[in-house]
């Protein structure tokens, strides 16, 4: 027997064909959401408060300080928040201290700071009753970047940019004349020496001394206009920068100085963030820049005088490691003191080394480092600017390397916590201005923190973010896999990110650093391709927001692959060589072969085993969760694998789902972490279990109660239904499944079914990927799903009186009211179809001016129907089904309703949708198709043992698409069915063809895995043997019921009077200009005329035509289309004298709609009234006939 048994949870065993032993379990798959939010609660929120506070007033006599904060209990539980359309949020109370610096008085007070949405255990937020997800954003990391560009003459120039988290950009660039310029905040460029002089180094020799001799420096000094040799050059340089930043304003040295300080050196205005400081220090650090260079001077320990490294030595990694503590200490440190006019007058500490030029061995190049400022320094320092300039000048000398912006070492993730912190910071900054004004205006003695703090800007910023940000998305709840994928999504769009139109190919492309960090397969097709990605299965964020992936460490001394796990970011991985997970190992953990396949900086090649530093932990670390659920992924073309991964997320939860016979072993983990199942929080024993709740007694005697959700409407209108798995007496361990969620079976993801599939054509019905299906799948509800739709009706106060919900509806027969209760609300369990009343509601209507006689009659007989009109909630088109639930909210019951609403009724209707012709189906390999014919079971082809085939697919769909995985799945699935087992074939480590054939033979199938099929209609065998097997097929959310649409009479657009478009508006089909050309080409003038008039926007014409048809008279001639009148009016509005003349040059009157001259034209608001009148006349006729 090939393969080995593996248990997944307590309910499933699979035969796995994996060969590589897993050394690391998958992390919790939604930790990117939950961990980030927890960090925000623990430290992120505190940091934001500490960034903005303390706040002083303008005279610096009062100061508001932050003390601490506390979250109280949420107002609603999760379930209540869903029912009441409320947000699941907790009140936050912040303690402030107000210090009066003149009197020393301190007032401490706790201030309510609004309700803050709280993340659920599933990684989602409930906002206004709907479940939402904050998608993590992939952005360019703050830091310093260097680039090169080739001009039209083929000359290479260099550029550099310092990008902060917030603040002004600082750029450097060279031009064709070899002069270096700087730009501050995207303004006009100035020679870079001007900025150096502004920093307090005004002499030409001083500048050369710092950066060393180079053509770029000399040319720029020549170009620099500040020639007078004194410290006043600094003043002039400052003024020139001021003029660039604030053109037209009067410039003084002091204002120039304070402006530059504010732009770069003030931590409140300029913030690199922790990650920016880390990236700047890493890039400008002297150690990485000296690597593999030849040193041009002796390196001497200043304290002992000992020569550490002699001139001419190559600075290999081992040499640098040997003097590392000296490099981190005071080796070659120079302290420069700026002149008194400088922006920052503190001494500037730099590290300077001289190395041999890689281009010209006779020249010496100076490398200047920023001497590693502390991580706490979040603003730029003069040392950073000088070190950046040095790196930039070194690039022209062949030292250093330019950055690749698409490298994942330069792109980071902003997860929920950080996005929320940024939003909170915006709110606090708005509040700060407010507070400062109030502190200055009001009397200091009576001020309390409560009085000066207005929390509205903060709550508004948070609300706006959750409600309308591009990154706050309605959760994709088609099935558990789509929930999980949505929580792990990484978007490069959104505020501060890219836009679809500006993103080129490079940003969207797969990059070698995506390996193990971002899935190269799962991304949408269409305009967002490559901009929206998914985290790989083992991906994990470090404290700076860079994605790490785990590797097994290789002990270089012994050559052993250890089980020690090291997590590396993309730029750390660039320094090492990594072997693949399938490298063959001996028993003792050493490599079995001298040469192994590996990767180094994007090169995939063979390496000697002795140079390998790390080994992949698992073959599936490359791909995301949805992709890891595709068996035989390694045999599919990547374009089709992309479709397969995406379509699994569109699977509709079925009534009785089945886990796949051929899985990948990922199904259990995906279901477990998706948040859709009920998972045990602690060990214990089940003491009660039914469909709605499970009670578990812990070992310490306490009782846990788990509520099971039954048929709740999901975000996408499917039934969210959980099924209990445990029974009384079961022993449960922490992490076990208590109940399956939707699309799960026995604790495994189960998106579809395992039908018997044959690859064969049949009467041409599976042309172009169409799917032929057996009636068995319809009759036995194999592909039946339940869909829930929610309808609501509310009563409001109107000017003419309140609306009311009632059974007494004017002009409605008793038949229509049979399922309404005494209030006029539909009963639960009623079967309803289109047009049925769900909630009876009447609205008062304005009285027309009645004569005295009419008023008298009205008063005597009290004719109710005159005063109110019927505004009942009715079942819309396509909403037929069974009433599943009714919820009533009223003010009297203490429900919170919008202002002006007195009562709200919600009705939930369940539909059972069987599979039908026109529904879309798919396999897991991107093989999708539409059901074209449902054939009676007796007519389907059958196997020699009499089993009829369930589905027939077109074999032509395989070769050109190159997704051969489906054929392998087919054969292995048949073997699994015959053997009565389930199989796991993990991606890139699954069943080989030998395993496949061994299993096929074991199952007693023929050696070619094909079979003879018999025609169900004739009983004759087909000519050729056919591939028949079991393939996992899913029903997708694109159902024909949601798409089929037809219109007879419906609404019209107000301006053009043309029919609306789209199914939702009950619209018509657009007859566009190309269709008009087609009819013109045929010369079908009468057809064309009626399409452009009666059927479109000839208002009077269509009313006359309707009347003529209903009365059986000939249809009158059409009039002028309304859109022509609109065109004439638009031209007249431009002041053009536009008239319409007939063939005798007489002006044709274009009548306005409201000037009804002709009495025999019906002026009807809508055709409904005409219909009612017609129906009434017909009824009267039939009544008189009955009487006769």
Curated annotation (Swiss-Prot):
Q: What GO molecular functions are on record for this protein?
A: DNA binding; DNA-directed RNA polymerase activity; ribonucleoside binding
Q: Which superkingdom?
A: Bacteria
Q: What is its EC number?
A: 2.7.7.6
Q: Which reaction does it catalyse?
A: RNA(n) + a ribonucleoside 5'-triphosphate = RNA(n+1) + diphosphate
Question: Which UniProt keywords are given for this protein, alphabetically ordered?
Answer: DNA-directed RNA polymerase, Nucleotidyltransferase, Transcription, Transferase
Query: Could you tell me the Gene Ontology terms of the biological process aspect for this record?
Result: DNA-templated transcription
InterPro entries the UniProt entry points to: DNA-dir_RNA_pol_bsu_ext_1_sf (IPR042107), DNA-dir_RNA_pol_bsu_external_1 (IPR019462), DNA-dir_RNA_pol_su2 (IPR015712), DNA-dir_RNAP_su2_dom (IPR007120), DNA-dir_RNAP_su2_hyb_sf (IPR037033), RNA_pol_bsu_bac (IPR010243), RNA_pol_bsu_CS (IPR007121), RNA_pol_bsu_protrusion (IPR007644)
Tell me, what does this protein do in biology?
DNA-dependent RNA polymerase catalyzes the transcription of DNA into RNA using the four ribonucleoside triphosphates as substrates.
Its quaternary organisation is: The RNAP catalytic core consists of 2 alpha, 1 beta, 1 beta' and 1 omega subunit. When a sigma factor is associated with the core the holoenzyme is formed, which can initiate transcription.
The name under which this protein is listed is: DNA-directed RNA polymerase subunit beta
Q: Which organism is this protein's natural source?
A: Streptococcus pyogenes serotype M1
UniProt lists the gene as: rpoB
């Amino acid at each position: 027997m090939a393969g080995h048994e593996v248990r997944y949870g307590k309910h499933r065993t699979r035969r796995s064909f994996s060969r590589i032993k897993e050394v690391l379990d998958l992390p919790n798959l939604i930790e990117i959401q939950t961990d980030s939010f927890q960090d925000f609660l623990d430290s992120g929120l505190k940091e934001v408060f500490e960034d903005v506070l303390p706040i002083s007033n303008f005279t610096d006599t009062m100061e508001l300080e932050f003390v601490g904060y506390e979250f109280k209990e949420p107002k609603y539980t999760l379930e209540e928040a869903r029912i009441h359309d409320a947000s699941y949020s907790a009140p936050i109370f912040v303690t402030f201290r107000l210090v009066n610096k003149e009197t020393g008085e301190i007032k401490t007070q706790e201030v309510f700071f609004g309700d803050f949405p709280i993340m659920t255990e599933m990684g989602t937020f409930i906002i206004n009753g709907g479940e939402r997800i904050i998608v993590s954003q992939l952005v360019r990391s703050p830091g310093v970047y260097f680039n090169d560009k080739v001009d039209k003459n083929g000359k290479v120039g260099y550029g550099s940019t310092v990008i902060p988290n917030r603040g002004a950009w600082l750029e450097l660039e060279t031009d064709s004349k070899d002069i270096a310029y700087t730009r501050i905040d995207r303004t006009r460029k100035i020679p870079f020496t001007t900025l150096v002089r502004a920093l307090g180094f005004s002499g030409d020799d001083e500048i050369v001394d710092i950066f060393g001799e180079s053509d770029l420096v000399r040319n720029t000094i020549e170009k620099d206009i500040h020639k007078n040799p004194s410290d006043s050059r600094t003043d002039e340089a400052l003024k020139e920068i001021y003029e660039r930043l604030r053109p037209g304003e009067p410039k003084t040295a002091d204002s120039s100085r304070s402006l530059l300080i504010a732009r770069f050196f003030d931590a409140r205005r300029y913030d690199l963030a922790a990650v920016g400081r880390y990236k700047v220090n890493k890039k400008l650090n002297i150690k990485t820049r000296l690597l593999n260079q030849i040193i041009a001077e002796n390196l001497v320990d200043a304290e002992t005088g000992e020569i550490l490294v002699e001139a001419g030595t190559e600075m290999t990694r081992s040499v640098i490691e040997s003097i590392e503590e000296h490099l981190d200490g005071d080796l070659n440190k120079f302290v420069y003191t700026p002149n008194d006019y400088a922006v920052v007058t503190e001494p500037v500490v730099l590290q300077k080394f001289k190395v041999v030029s890689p281009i010209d061995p006779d020249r010496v190049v100076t490398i200047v480092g920023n001497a590693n400022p502390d991580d706490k320094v979040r603003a730029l320092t003069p040392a950073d600017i000088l070190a950046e300039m040095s790196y930039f000048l070194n690039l022209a000398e062949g030292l250093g390397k330019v950055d690749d912006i698409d490298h994942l070492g330069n792109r980071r993730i902003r997860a929920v916590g950080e996005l929320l912190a940024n939003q909170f910071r915006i709110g606090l900054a708005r509040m700060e201005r407010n507070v400062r004004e109030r502190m200055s205006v009001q009397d200091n003695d009576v001020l309390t923190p409560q009085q000066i703090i207005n929390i509205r800007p903060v709550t508004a910023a948070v609300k706006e973010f959750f409600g309308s940000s591009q990154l706050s998305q309605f959760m994709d709840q088609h099935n558990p896999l789509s929930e999980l994928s949505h929580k792990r999504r990484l978007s490069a769009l959104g505020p501060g990110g890219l836009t679809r139109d500006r993103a080129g190919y490079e940003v969207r492309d797969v990059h070698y650093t995506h390996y193990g960090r971002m899935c190269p397969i799962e991304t949408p097709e269409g305009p967002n391709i490559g901009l929206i990605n998914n985290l790989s299965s083992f991906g994990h964020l470090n404290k700076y927001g860079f994605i790490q992936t785990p590797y097994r460490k290789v002990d270089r001394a012994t050559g052993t692959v250890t089980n020690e796990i090291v997590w590396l970011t993309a730029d750390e991985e660039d320094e090492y060589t990594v072997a693949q997970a399938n490298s063959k190992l001996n028993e003792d953990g050493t490599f079995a072969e001298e040469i192994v396949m590996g990767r180094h900086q994007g090169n995939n090649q063979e390496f000697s085993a002795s140079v390998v530093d790390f080994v992949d932990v698992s073959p599936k670390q490359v791909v995301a969760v949805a992709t890891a659920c595709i068996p035989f992924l390694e045999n599919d073309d990547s374009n089709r694998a992309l479709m397969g991964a995406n379509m699994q997320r569109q699977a509709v939860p079925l009534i009785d789902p089945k886990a796949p016979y051929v899985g990948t072993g990922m199904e259990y983990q995906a279901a477990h972490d998706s948040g859709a199942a009920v998972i045990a929080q602690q060990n214990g024993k089940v003491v009660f279990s039914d469909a709605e709740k499970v009670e578990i007694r812990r070992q310490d005697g306490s009782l846990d109660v788990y509520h099971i959700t039954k048929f709740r409407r999901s975000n996408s209108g499917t039934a969210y239904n959980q099924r209990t798995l445990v029974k009384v007496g079961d022993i449960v361990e922490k992490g076990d499944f208590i109940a399956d969620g939707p699309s799960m079976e026995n604790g495994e993801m189960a998106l579809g079914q395992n039908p018997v599939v044959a690859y064969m054509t049949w009467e041409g019905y599976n042309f172009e990927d169409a799917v032929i299906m057996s009636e068995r799948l319809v009759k036995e509800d194999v592909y039946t799903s339940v869909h829930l739709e929610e309808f609501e009706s509310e009563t409001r106060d109107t000017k003419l009186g309140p609306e009311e919900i009632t059974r007494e509806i004017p002009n409605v027969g008793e038949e229509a009211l049979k399922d309404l209760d005494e209030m006029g609300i539909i009963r639960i369990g009623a079967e309803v179809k289109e047009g049925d009343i769900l909630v009876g509601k009447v609205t008062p209507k304005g009285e027309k001016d009645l004569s005295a006689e009419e008023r008298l009659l009205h008063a005597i007989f009290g004719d109710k129907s005159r005063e109110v009109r019927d505004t009942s909630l009715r079942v819309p088109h396509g909403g037929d089904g069974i009433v599943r639930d009714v919820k009533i909210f009223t003010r009297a019951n203490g429900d919170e309703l919008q202002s002006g609403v007195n009562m709200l009724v919600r009705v939930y209707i369940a539909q059972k949708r069987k599979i039908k012709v026109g529904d879309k189906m798919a396999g897991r390999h991107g093989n999708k198709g539409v059901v074209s014919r449902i054939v009676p079971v007796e007519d389907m082809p059958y196997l020699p043992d009499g089993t009829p085939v369930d589905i027939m697919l077109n074999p032509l769909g395989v070769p050109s698409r190159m997704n051969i995985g489906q054929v392998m799945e087919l054969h292995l699935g048949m073997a699994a069915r015959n053997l009565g087992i389930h199989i796991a074939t993990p991606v890139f480590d699954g069943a080989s063809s030998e395993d496949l054939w061994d299993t096929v033979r074991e199952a007693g199938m023929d050696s070619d895995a094909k079979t003879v099929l018999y025609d169900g209609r004739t009983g004759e065998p087909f000519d050729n043997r056919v591939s028949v097997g079991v393939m996992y097929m899913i029903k997708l959310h694109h159902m024909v019921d949601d798409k089929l649409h037809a219109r007879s009479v419906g609404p019209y657009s107000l301006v053009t009077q043309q029919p609306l478009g789209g199914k939702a508006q009950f619209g018509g089909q657009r007859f566009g200009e190309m269709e008009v050309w087609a009819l013109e080409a045929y010369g079908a003038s009468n057809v064309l005329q009626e399409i452009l008039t009666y059927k479109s926007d000839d208002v009077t014409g269509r009313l006359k035509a309707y009347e003529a048809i209903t009365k059986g008279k000939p249809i009158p001639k059409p009039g002028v289309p309304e859109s022509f009148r609109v065109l004439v009016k638009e031209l007249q509005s431009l002041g053009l004298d536009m008239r319409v003349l007939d063939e005798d040059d007489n002006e044709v009157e274009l009548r306005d709609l409201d000037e009804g001259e002709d009495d025999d034209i019906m002026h009807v608001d809508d055709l409904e009234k005409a219909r009612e009148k017609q129906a009434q006349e017909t009824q009267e006729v039939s009544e008189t006939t009955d009487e006769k």
